Amino acid sequence: MKSVFTISASLAISLMLCCTAQANDHKLLGVIAMPRNETNDLALKLPVCRIVKRIQLSADHGDLQLSGASVYFKAARSASQSLNIPSEIKEGQTTDWININSDNDNKRCVSKITFSGHTVNSSDMATLKIIGDD
């Protein structure tokens, strides 16, 4: 009887851990080195097209100034969406979640994300980390 209880408890704990791991589905999509001069063609191409509901941006090294961002979806019409992003991200700072792919009926997968911006207050290139949540 004791072994049956132990097995049942172990299975219950395993299921709780499994579900907890699935609930936090954040993935590092990529990192972009930001040049010191304003550039409008910085692209993060996703090698595997994936459905991404929202993203976070983080400045890992140096301060960033951003002037725009767009998400491109794999679709027959090459659909895209402009993102509302903060104009500055300080080193070590992470943005709130930025919602994308709001069309719940037609789950489109993201093929690339483009950024316009540059490094500020640093002689080194800052890095922009993009985290996705599906």
Swiss-Prot record:
InterPro entries found in the cross-reference section: UPF0412_YaaI
Task: Specify the signal sequence span.
Answer: 1-23
Q: What Pfam families does the annotation carry? A: DUF2541
Which keywords, in A-to-Z order, does the entry hold? Signal
NCBIfam families annotated for this entry?
Answer: PRK10154.1
The family assignment reads: Belongs to the UPF0412 family.
Q: What is the protein name stated in its UniProt record?
A: UPF0412 protein YaaI
Organism source for this protein? Answer: Shigella dysenteriae serotype 1 (strain Sd197)
Its taxonomic path starts at: Bacteria, Pseudomonadati, Pseudomonadota, Gammaproteobacteria, Enterobacterales
